[in-house]
């Protein structure tokens, strides 16, 4: 007999151990002979990471598919691993050194510091792997990989050197996102926009050959900027070619205030004639758009910042070129050189004001890009970096999606994919860090570059180049973490070696990931997979949405609305969390997570546990020779039919990535049809004297529960595994763990039995609804009068007389030609069901109660409708607040409909 309650905390570790002992998650475990492969690579979490809700959703979805396909007998591999997370890991270890008052990385030296990171990884890294196991992730943990392990590092070297020799990797001076705190280039995904209350400064730039007069607008043009310090690097002013105000000025120069540099006025579509004065100052070395304008118009790029974002003028050859060093300019250089960018901003504005160049200052709230790790505003910065020719690699990756070799689900994301790929920029792959794959480039005495897989090979290449041995210096930069991640689907399978795993599992079947890394990771895996394997890396990309809080707001520490999945698992168990995420994971829709929902789905697990316990108490046990087609009782043939239908719906739902529909179908069958109705129908049979009926009911219930454990296993693996082991045939053990049991393939259906019992369910449900709407006391028994019933319906009433009376609290059933006075009515098929209410409730009092309720609902609806009609409210209120009001309005409309139905019934009864 089962324990009275299911203890998730005690059971889950025990079940995990059982799976481990059975080798249930090993590649190919439980596969049928000659089975098709089903391979999934996990999006590698950062080695520094801890499980968050995004991981929980992502890995729940993967695990549902992996367990499902394993039970279907496929040759399954779920490949786990972790990312070395360059910046994040380096920062964690640097912080640890500071906390322990140990020498910093510069004092320690590169080699010792990297040793220290490996030591940290051995002690603390990989916590997330254990957290994923706790969630129930059925990866082949014996194959866990790390993006810095030896095999993957070899793959990285092979790819870098090959691309370099093919001319697809090169060094170039371009703008990058530069973090002046961490002193490295960072990728777009590591940049977060923050709304800042700042200013827009409007400056007067004097026209050449005209004496400058602040009072005379014909002697200058006005430009506006949010970053006055960058004006020191201005090399042009752009106007729109269609803007007639400036036609005569195009080709002339303005004089850069404070500096005295002559800079041209150029015609370029980037300038918006509708925005401000229609002119734009162009600083190619400090703005991504300006960089492109500069290239189009042959403008110089003058960098005026140090890597730490201080002003550099004194020894800045580019800045000083062609300038007349007046006493005023020399004083400016002395004052500003070495000054922090924000202090320089303040001083430049003061100087512009003093000298008559400041037109006005506007308050201006705007988005300022910050480094998500360093936390300071980033600078577009001109440096020498390594680049991949992404445009060339993108072509086959676009073709693969266009011709359907790789499908993106939901399909609407394909447009985003193509938009990105068609406008792709060179990919900056170098980072100024120590932790990561060091770039395999060595420089000779004249800076000639040798890119090889090892120092020995670089020395041999240098010897061939110079005709003698020379000292080589290795590039100190490391590769962008996304570079090694882009090789993940084939590097984890042993490439560049030709391994059996690579031959079996590549291309992989499906990739499950968040839409936010479609470009940063998915597109790059497509590029690398097609280039090096000449084959797509995956057949399907399933993009899931975000997990938000219950109001639809994005979770963030600053808002204090972060939901911790580990805490949820502590409180409700892993199964409840997983099932909640699955049933809410509708394609393309964010998951609004309310912990109350998780409590509700824990109750679903409790319902299944209690149903199994109830079954055991009534002698339900597996009958080895049970066959659905041999069942005789309509109620058994009905539940077996509904089981087949539910199995079909769950199977189709998982197979088509509609996880919410699959979970919903399982939920409805278990909670509604099996627990609420079938077990209720069985009670008189279990208590009766018909032993044959009892035996058939026991065998049917056992069979159904056995299939239910299988259907629910991908969603709720722990509880179902426990129930499976505790409900084996008497005196026997199960042949296998549930994780390796065969997925149900059911075909039994009896349309007549299903129609018959579903009619009974609809009748009882309808009568109960009317009673609830009419406020009929729960204990009151009422007669039922039936009008217009055909022979089939009359027979059904006769056949189910006892069940109707017991379940719907019906006193007697009669068939009449006319509805009795004071009766509420409902339609069921061709018949009208009348429930006389006069003797059960005070119709007048009930009518008054309903009228009052209708008034309250109408007033509340009116209030919300006025609110939503207010454009100011919709524009200024937080998105989740507006959404909550819309949802409340929908709820009220449904409530109003219910009250209107009840009022109509009262009128009919009166």
Swiss-Prot record:
EC identifiers of the protein: 6.1.1.9
GO process annotations (BP): valyl-tRNA aminoacylation
CDD domains in UniProt: Anticodon_Ia_Val, ValRS_core
Cystines in this chain: none
Any one GO cellular component localisation term in the record: cytosol
UniProt catalytic activity: tRNA(Val) + L-valine + ATP = L-valyl-tRNA(Val) + AMP + diphosphate
Motif ('KMSKS' region): 554-558
Purpose of the protein: Catalyzes the attachment of valine to tRNA(Val). As ValRS can inadvertently accommodate and process structurally similar amino acids such as threonine, to avoid such errors, it has a 'posttransfer' editing activity that hydrolyzes mischarged Thr-tRNA(Val) in a tRNA-dependent manner.
Protein name per Swiss-Prot or TrEMBL: Valine--tRNA ligase
Organism: Brucella melitensis biotype 1 (strain ATCC 23456 / CCUG 17765 / NCTC 10094 / 16M)
Gene designation: valS
